[in-house]
Amino acid sequence: MKKKSIKDKEQENNWEEKVVQVKRVTKVVKGGKKLSFRAILIVGNEKGEIGVGIGKASDVIGAVKKGVTDAKKHIINVPLTKSYSIPHPIEGISGAAKVILRPSAIGSGVIAGGSTRTVLELAGVKNILAKQLRSSNTLNNARAVLNALSQLRTFQNTAQNRDINIERLFNM
């Protein structure tokens, strides 16, 4: 049986990539300043899989390519409800950035700003309320959302952790 390559997996999952930020950064060396680019990318398949990555290179295209490979290395699965929302409210922290995510009613849409909105849309979340607190840093806010989404638990996970069946969980 043939082993699946990375390109086969890419075509299978239909990954969508979005560049959130491209920044010119400099490094001071003996001969002067060395210029390079840093790209922050978000990769998702809109079916509950999402990843955030960073790429640095001397040109923008190289930085974007490195960012895509980095994002695909850090992919997490997000449990979504039937209404394409999250199962319960949650908070995520990365650095100084704090993000609060709350499930929302059908038809309310993605109410979020900046990189938080991009992460949630590429994850496949369609109804959610989000608020960024304490920091406006693009990278830390994206990572805070990823941190929050990775902490989400379904009813089945909770029931298994407590060693009870789902019906008993609802009767409590």
Swiss-Prot record:
Keywords linked to the UniProt accession: Chloroplast, Plastid, Ribonucleoprotein, Ribosomal protein, RNA-binding, rRNA-binding
Gene Ontology BP annotations: translation
Disulfide pattern: none
One Gene Ontology MF term: structural constituent of ribosome
GO cellular component, one term: chloroplast
Top-level taxon in the UniProt lineage: Eukaryota
Pfam families hit by this protein: Ribosomal_S5, Ribosomal_S5_C
Keyword Ribosomal protein part of the UniProt annotation: yes
Cross-referenced Gene3D superfamilies: 3.30.160.20, 3.30.230.10
Plastid is among the record's keywords: yes
Cellular localization per UniProt: Plastid, Chloroplast
Ranges where the S5 DRBM domain occurs: 15-78
Record remark: domains: The N-terminal domain interacts with the head of the 30S subunit; the C-terminal domain interacts with the body and contacts protein S4. The interaction surface between S4 and S5 is involved in control of translational fidelity.
Family: Belongs to the universal ribosomal protein uS5 family.
Self-association and partners: Part of the 30S ribosomal subunit. Contacts protein S4.
Function: With S4 and S12 plays an important role in translational accuracy.
UniProt-recorded name of the protein: Small ribosomal subunit protein uS5c
Organism in which the protein naturally occurs: Gracilaria tenuistipitata var. liui (Red alga)
Name of the encoding gene: rps5
